[in-house]
Curated annotation (Swiss-Prot):
It comes from Haemophilus influenzae (strain ATCC 51907 / DSM 11121 / KW20 / Rd). PROSITE patterns: DHFR_1 (PS00075), DHFR_2 (PS51330). It catalyses: (6S)-5,6,7,8-tetrahydrofolate + NADP(+) = 7,8-dihydrofolate + NADPH + H(+). InterPro entries: DHFR, DHFR-like_dom_sf, DHFR_CS, DHFR_dom. The gene is folA. GO terms for biological process: dihydrofolate metabolic process; folic acid metabolic process; one-carbon metabolic process; response to antibiotic; tetrahydrofolate biosynthetic process. Key enzyme in folate metabolism. Catalyzes an essential reaction for de novo glycine and purine synthesis, and for DNA precursor synthesis. NCBIfam families: PRK10769.1. This is Dihydrofolate reductase.
Amino acid sequence: MTFSLIVATTLNNVIGKDNQMPWHLPADLAWFRQNTTGKPVIMGRKTFESIGRPLPKRTNIVLSRQLFEHEGVIWKDSFESAVNFVRDFDEIMLIGGGELFKQYLPKADKLYLTQIQTELDGDTFFPQLNWEEWEIEFDEYRKADEQNRYDCRFLILTRK
């Protein structure tokens, strides 16, 4: 099983502000959907609350120390029990938030990274990557357009 993280960050590693993403980029949402559909997605409670609903065509697992009940969502109280629950899948995706990324980035096999080519204010950050540990498997640059305010770089990184 491949353990992957998927995240969008600014150049200053911002991933959120006030429990929301401080940008709206349809290109990144499409990238996220393309790379997570059909796979189990693991997220923290705050990330689920910011999304507001289970993601369709995915097994939605919410990690929380406290019992969490919501239709279409599986609650687990530990990362290990979540992984054990979806152990038969080829790939599992950790989709946030900040604390889980910090804790589990060192264990990740793969990273789907959207680099938003700007710096923004935020209160939640992705850890600084050590690029020596990663090999670029995919790299696509997309210029800003009428729907996407910022240039984006879409990367798939695999651990060396």
